[in-house]
Amino acid sequence: MFISSFILLTSQRVQAQKEVLYSQYLLNPLSINPAYAGSRESFQLSAFLRRKWISVRYAPVTQSVSADGAIANGRIGLGFQALNDRMGLFATTGAYGSVAYRFNMPALAKLSIGFQGGVNVIPIYDVTTAASINRAVASLGVGVYYQSDRFFAGISAPELGGQVTDATGRYVYKSARPIMFQAGAPIEVGETTVLIPSLLVSKIADRPLGVDINLRAWFDEEFGLGLSYRQNSPGLIQTNYLQAFAEYQLTKAIRLAYTFNSQTPESPNAMQYDQKSVHEIMLRFSPNALKFMY
């Protein structure tokens, strides 16, 4: 019973780890599509801290960083992501690198094709030694991204990794392998307000179709608000939840954001607790921003 429970929990935690990244896509599109790398053309570094049960010691917590930029006159984008996801005594880590090649399109639009490779390091229970050992699991992803001043869209498979078995041949981890399609458009409302409605459709084999309906608003290129309704999120738990966030451009180079999720889709036991919500903060540094990016 203990062995089965441990194996199940470690498998759940790795899938949970990926869901943490997926949920950040409105603030960090690189988390679901490697073709986004370098789309801003200037370097940027983002740090995220995600925590559940703020008043509880040893509560689930995730730290992640994301960085990307462009080289070769903007034709090649490079990206990097890393995270550490801890829940009680269990912790998983991951690091992923992305590269994208950008094609010039009519009307100053860009079309990018991107690839991602990396590794997840997860705790696996070894029945032959009755001990927990860390296993490295390859992570692969691909994507296509189109961007213009009036429209953006992308399709991606952010996780094409395989599966892991223990010494007895039992599966202890299988990648969920979601396929994602995203589209949206910035709409100017007056001289100082921009609305950005968008949609994300995700599909995982043998699961219902996931649909996110999103709306962001920026005012004077200084303050932003966002709301997202997510149905059948692409994580361990198929759940519907709301995500709300606020962003503030402290300086030309520094942006701060706060995100609130009404549910914790990445936690296998989230529905058993009274406090189901989770909080996240982001700090972004863009030292040489060429223009304001939403």
Set out the residue ranges of the language-model regions.
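Bacterial Sec-dependent N-terminal signal peptides
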Residues: 1-19, 187, 215, 277, ...
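Conserved catalytic core of Hanks-type protein kinase domains
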Residues: 37, 70, 218, 249
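Short polar/acidic secondary-structure junctions
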Residues: 39, 72, 104, 188, ...
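Glycine- and aromatic-enriched membrane insertion/assembly motifs of diderm outer-membrane
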Residues: 56-78, 157
